[in-house]
């Protein structure tokens, strides 16, 4: 069956959450938003494209930083309202220069930084 981004369930703002996961290690790297056009561009080019809610513009991951995300596989959840992007990550995924945006853990009621910025 051919894929049509319009078959996905978008929120009231026309967006769908997308979780980026390293295809080789399974590490969750980040979560961002996509609209139908960002999904289509990602599938078409193989370069992950998100929708920036703050800038109201497309955001090709790594276009300016060089920290590119290459799409290996796109998975759709059972309700078609969330995407899992299995990717190959070049450099850090987070704008804080960390491998993952999920670098703060709650341990024994305290927030702990568990990942240092990459050099």
From Swiss-Prot:
KW Membrane (keyword) present: no
Superkingdom per UniProt:
Bacteria
Compartment(s) of residence: Cytoplasm
Species annotation: Cereibacter sphaeroides (strain ATCC 17023 / DSM 158 / JCM 6121 / CCUG 31486 / LMG 2827 / NBRC 12203 / NCIMB 8253 / ATH 2.4.1.) (Rhodobacter sphaeroides)
Name the chain's protein.
Answer: Phosphoribosyl-AMP cyclohydrolase
- Associated pathway: Amino-acid biosynthesis; L-histidine biosynthesis; L-histidine from 5-phospho-alpha-D-ribose 1-diphosphate: step 3/9
Cofactor binding annotation: Binds 1 Mg(2+) ion per subunit. Binds 1 zinc ion per subunit.
InterPro entries, per database record: PRA-CH (IPR026660), PRib_AMP_CycHydrolase_dom (IPR002496), PRib_AMP_CycHydrolase_sf (IPR038019)
Q: What does the subunit section of this Swiss-Prot or TrEMBL entry state?
A: Homodimer.
Q: Gene encoding it?
A: hisI
- What keywords sit in the KW lines? Amino-acid biosynthesis, Cytoplasm, Histidine biosynthesis, Hydrolase, Magnesium, Metal-binding, Zinc
